[in-house]
Amino acid sequence: MKRWAAGVLTITVLAAACGQQTQKSEDASPVRRAAPDYLSQPLVREIYTADPSAHVWNGKIYVYPSHDVDGPTKQDDLGSHFEMRDYRVLSMDKIGGPVRVGPVALDVKDVGWADKQMWAPDAAVKNGTYYLYFPAKDRDGAFRIGVATSRNPMGPFKPQPAPIKGSYSIDPAVFTDDDGSSYMYFGGIWGGQLQRNVNGRFDPNGSKTDLGQDDKPALAPRVARMTGDMLEFAEPPRPVQILDEKGMPLLGGDHDRRFFEASWMHKYKGKYYFSYSTGDTHYLVYAIGESPYGPFTYKGRILEPVEGWTTHHSIVRWNGRWWLFYADSQLSGQTRLRNVKVTELHYAADGTIRTINPFTSPKAP
């Protein structure tokens, strides 16, 4: 584990288009590259970070990432080697400027119901209170989603005594619409256990991957409107329907397009953009809808495969431009030790997103 140290790093943000497909297993060793081969450079180097959820509040940019550590668990397809134990918030006054690494904002030892694996978080603000949403495994080995509060966006955050009632799986992402209503999107298959919670109840003996039904609709992420105090679901979670160009649900066997994990929602010119990772094919993709509940029609790729296995992101508007926060394994070359990055995101005139290549040169053979 790397210790925190105060420091800054000036980053250079570039933009590019096009890319290539890379298919690899969870335990594959990434091909190492020289720093100039990457489109963007790591935001921080003091600690390993991933799964960046970025927000613009009070004129500043706050990033809520996972905090990767080098634990003893052997790498597997369930992500058991992702042994995160706490959260630290990154902040910056501008993209391209110094980045501050905050102290511990929340530690697993302070969450009474949680046992381990504090994976990808998100955050929200309402009436001066900041909310940190996070998944963790309970003592039965089931992922639940908790919430902690603070008056400071950097924390420290005080957790609620129990997870959100009716929550399960991983990757919470909270979107607040123009009318003030907030919605949580969540879920992830394989190690994220969505396939073990099909009926809202955790089955410890369920599938380790998905439902194994390639010719039937893929497992869908979930969405639920939040209560006014942002601490609970105001309704039972419902599936988020992702459709193809013919209006049919994406199938479980369509690994290049179907949902795997890493939900994110943003709004652009009145349309709702639901983006997510395809997991084992390593694409970051998106679909567009007319309502925060969907349905959403698949439109294409945002980001081609990065170095490392996972792709988890956020999209925010800052200074009149749109930005994609993501992560790769540039610093370590290990899938469990990642680093967050940012690059500019561009829309075409028709509202589609131009695909980004995370590298500046083709991959070596």
Predicted region positions:
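Bacterial N-terminal signal peptides that target proteins for export
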Residues: M1-V8
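Residue-level signal for mature regions of secreted extracellular proteins and peptides
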Residues: I11-T12
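C-terminal motif of bacterial Sec signal peptides marking the signal peptidase cleavage site
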Residues: A15-A17
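Carbohydrate-active catalytic/glycan-binding domains of CAZyme proteins
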Residues: Q20-P365
